[in-house]
Each structure stands twice: as C-alpha cells, then as structure tokens.
C-alpha cells in the first residue's frame, strides 16, 4: 500500500510540475506592478481591498492618475490638431494614413494620457455609486497590427479612468500581429503596468474568436469589450456596471463618441444619443430614439433600449454571456457578429441598452484597415438562425449571399431551441417596430433593367451622409442587389430600400428623377412619388403625365429622364429581374 501511495504521490507531483510549467509558458507576459511614472503616469501603488471605513468617494480613484493637463499640448482636452509639415514629413504622414487609415503621424505626437473635457449631463456627474456593491470587470481588447500610440492610449485611458476597486484586469489579445513593435517592445512596456495581461494567438482568429479567447482568461464578474483605438471618458465604467448589477440580462453599451481619424478631435455627444438599427442588407445603422422609448423613460439618465449595437464597445455579465451562448464562433474576422448577438439577446429574453452617462471615444478610421471577405457569410449565418421567413428580404437585397457557404448551423439552432427564444416577427413588433418591413411582392422587386439600353439598370448612389442627395441614373447591371435593388409597392411607390427607405420622385418643373424619404407606414402617399408600373413595361408618372425614359447624354453616358410617353419608344420599356 505504501508503494502504491508513493507512486501516486510522485505522479501527483509530476502533474503539478507540468501544470506549473504550462502556466509559466502560457502566461509568458504576466501581470506586474508598475514602477513609478511608468508610461508617463503617476502610480498610486498596489491596492488592497478597501477597509470598511473607506469613504465611498475614495473608492472612485483609478489605478493611475493622469499627469497634470498641459493646455498647450497637441490634442489636449480633445481639441483638433494639425501639424505644420515639410515635404518629407508630409510624405511620412500620408504613408502612415495609407497603412492604418488613421493619422498615426499626429497620434504619435499626442500624449498617451491626454485629458478629455467632461461634457456629460449634470445628472450623470452628480450621480453617486455604491462601489462596494458593484461587480468587477475584465476589460478585453483584441487587436491586429494596431498602431503603437492608439493601442497604448486605449490602455492608459482605461487605467486612468476606471476605479481601481472595479477594474480586475485589462486583457490584451494579440491576434497574430506581425509588426515588430508589437512583439518584445510591447511586452516590455506592459510589464511596467499593473493589471495588464497580454495573450497571443497561435493563428489568425478574427475578432470574434480573439475576444472569446480573452473572455476565457477573464476573472472579473463582467466582461467589458473595447476596440483598440478608444479613449474612455471620466465616469464611463460605473454606469455600465451598476446597470448590470441591477439586471444581469442587460447588455449595456456606452455612448460612442467620435474621435476624428485625421485631427484627433474628440466629439462628445451632449444631447440624446442615437440607438442602433439595421437595414435589410443587415448593415448596422444609427437611428434617433423613437417617441415610445422617450415616453417609457422617466429620467434623462435612464438607459435607452436599442434594437442593435455597433458591437465594438459593450459590457455583459460573464455568466449571462456564457448562458446566452457567447459569440457565434463560426463567424470569421469581423462583421455581422454585432447584429447576431443583438437579435439573440432580445429574442432570448435579455435586453440591449445604451447608457447616456457612459462615454467612450472611438477613432473611426478613414476606411476599414483590412478587408472583410466573410461579411456576407457572417450575416447569412445570422439570417439563417434568427430571422425566420424575414431572411428573404436580406437575400433579395444580397443575391450573392444565397451562394455563401455559411457552415454548420446545427449548434446555433439548438441553442435557440434550448433558450426558448422568440420569433423574429416578435422582435420586429416589440423591439424594432419603427422598421419598415418590405412587401417584396413576387415579380415586383429586384433590378430594373432598361429594354432600350439592355446592358443598363436603374441605379442610385447617394453621397455619404446625404441619402437624398443624388438622382436616379443608369449603370451596368451587376446582379449584386445593393444600389440596384428596387421594390414596386402596393401603394404604387418605387422604393429604394436596401439602405434607407427612399421613394423615387419627380421634383416640380424638373425632368430628372430624385429621391425623397418615404412616408411612414399608414400616412398618405404624396402624389409626386406615385408611379404606374404597367404590364407593358412602361413606368408612368400620373402627376406629370410623363414616362421614365432611358437615353444617352452628349458624352455617350447612359442616364434617365422624364419624357412624353411614346408607346413605340423602346427606351421607355423596363422590366424587373432578380
């Protein structure tokens, strides 16, 4: 018996040593205390659990204190900055913009600890919190080839604005970056920062799986996900954690303030924030708060219910996130995961909110810094699992999505069944009732091809931030939906509703076709947006008594205008096709 015990003891000892070796290798960059002045910040020192006699206001202190503000420094208080550059410096700046889609040349010259003016509502500033009763959080920041200064400014911003008693850790997840400065240089830098851990993936995982890797190592009660080019404002964390402490089924987002990619000006929203929505291509959109939600809230600082979230910045109870099925790991890189999670939380008994007292700035790059080749695959997965029969509206506007190999969905569908989730019809009626649901009547939606110039289809391409700022035109038929998808409704409207609900109109005394916002459901239809799409293929506008006609400009470019109807003119014939 003694011999058996000795061998068992040896086996246990060997197993313990192997486990210890694994942990040492796995956490090659461990959490260390910061030396005084690390990264330019003043350390408060290692913090103990608060004593019972510690005052509540003292519990609000962050782990690190920002250096004193320098009103003359670039970007201080969130001001816009512009450098006077010579030809060589300007070339360097443009090269960095091309690489990162952000003005990193300027970012590198702005303090990592800059101060941001606190423009929160008075009620937010006056709000008191019971810190001892709030849950702790792990802040998870996944990154891939992020610029040095924007990544470090994000880290310092969290450390310098989050109460030390609430911030369990910052977990950085490096998704196989290949930039040299993100190797040993980053490890050395964060080894001087308290409560910051670095995890590196062994292969490119994409945002969804990289975040999940971070979540598996998190020890906080709440998971707070941030993008890697953010700046947190004063008091950003407490409202999120307090809301979750009161309702664990709430996923709560901060108000996302804009940091200009070129000047680094911090635009803080001071009024009512926008809420999330989507169009029928399953692209995220911002919307104003509807009246029924304003009426439901009793205070300006009450959380605002949102049908969807942007996805980059949110907090969720770790237990609830696991119960809800975390992320769909079948999604690649990024894109679509935000809508999938939004549909899931609402349909499965939770809620999604934006807290008006929590503000985090986000640098919106000039363009996406890397491609999203799997966006349609991701959105198709969301549509197949959560949208029921309404997924046809998505496919109609994204014909290539029907051919996407979106992978095995059996586990996600079982999850929906196990959680006893509601239908998408319920979601539209109870959560996003303001969204117009297309009719998509058979034979009356899709691309509208000209019979006179048969290679061309009606096309609408509005400028950014001005949905009605263009005219209807012709462009080569591409079969991709999008800007060539139209719907002829039972109200006799020609709707362009892939992005925004727009209706074709003929402005008074004009011969071109513009676009205006469609009337809300149930309201009268203006006469200038009523069309008769006849069986013979003509598109007649009763108010002007004219017909839509294709033609070529003097330069030979195909276009459309309104013209006297002529039954023999083939340029006035059109047909819908999928």
From Swiss-Prot:
Q: Which cofactor does it need?
A: Mn(2+)
List the InterPro entries.
GalNAc-T, Glyco_trans_2-like, Nucleotide-diphossugar_trans, Ricin_B-like_lectins, Ricin_B_lectin
Gene Ontology cellular component list: Golgi membrane; perinuclear region of cytoplasm
Swiss-Prot/TrEMBL catalytic activity: L-seryl-[protein] + UDP-N-acetyl-alpha-D-galactosamine = a 3-O-[N-acetyl-alpha-D-galactosaminyl]-L-seryl-[protein] + UDP + H(+); L-threonyl-[protein] + UDP-N-acetyl-alpha-D-galactosamine = a 3-O-[N-acetyl-alpha-D-galactosaminyl]-L-threonyl-[protein] + UDP + H(+)
- The record places the following residue ranges in the Lumenal compartment, namely 36-578
Top-rank taxon, per record: Eukaryota
Please list the residues annotated as glycosylated.
Answer: 471
State which ranges are Cytoplasmic (membrane side): 1-12
Segments for region (Catalytic subdomain A):
134-243
Question: Where does the UniProt annotation locate this protein?
Answer: Golgi apparatus membrane
Q: Which SMART domains match?
A: RICIN
Question: How is the protein disposed in the membrane?
Answer: Single-pass type II membrane protein
Where does the Ricin B-type lectin domain start and stop, copy by copy? 444-577
So where does this one cross the membrane? 13-35
Please tell me whether the keyword DNA-binding is annotated for this protein: no
For binding Mn(2+), which residues are annotated in this chain's numbering?
A: 227, 229, 362
Major enzyme class: transferase
Q: Where is this region: Catalytic subdomain B?
A: 303-365
**Binding annotation for substrate:** 175, 204, 334, 370
Record Gene3D superfamilies:
2.80.10.50, Spore Coat Polysaccharide Biosynthesis Protein SpsA, Chain A
**Marked site: Interaction with glycopeptide substrate:** 459, 478, 483
**Hey, which family's this protein in?**
Belongs to the glycosyltransferase 2 family. GalNAc-T subfamily.
| Function comment | Catalyzes the initial reaction in O-linked oligosaccharide biosynthesis, the transfer of an N-acetyl-D-galactosamine residue to a serine or threonine residue on the protein receptor. Has a highest activity toward EA2 peptide substrate and a much lower activity with EPO-T, Muc2, Muc1a, Muc1b.
Q: What is recorded about the domains?
A: There are two conserved domains in the glycosyltransferase region: the N-terminal domain (domain A, also called GT1 motif), which is probably involved in manganese coordination and substrate binding and the C-terminal domain (domain B, also called Gal/GalNAc-T motif), which is probably involved in catalytic reaction and UDP-Gal binding. The ricin B-type lectin domain directs the glycopeptide specificity. It is required in the glycopeptide specificity of enzyme activity but not for activity with naked peptide substrates, suggesting that it triggers the catalytic domain to act on GalNAc-glycopeptide substrates.
The protein depicted here goes by the name: Polypeptide N-acetylgalactosaminyltransferase 4
By which gene is this protein encoded? Galnt4
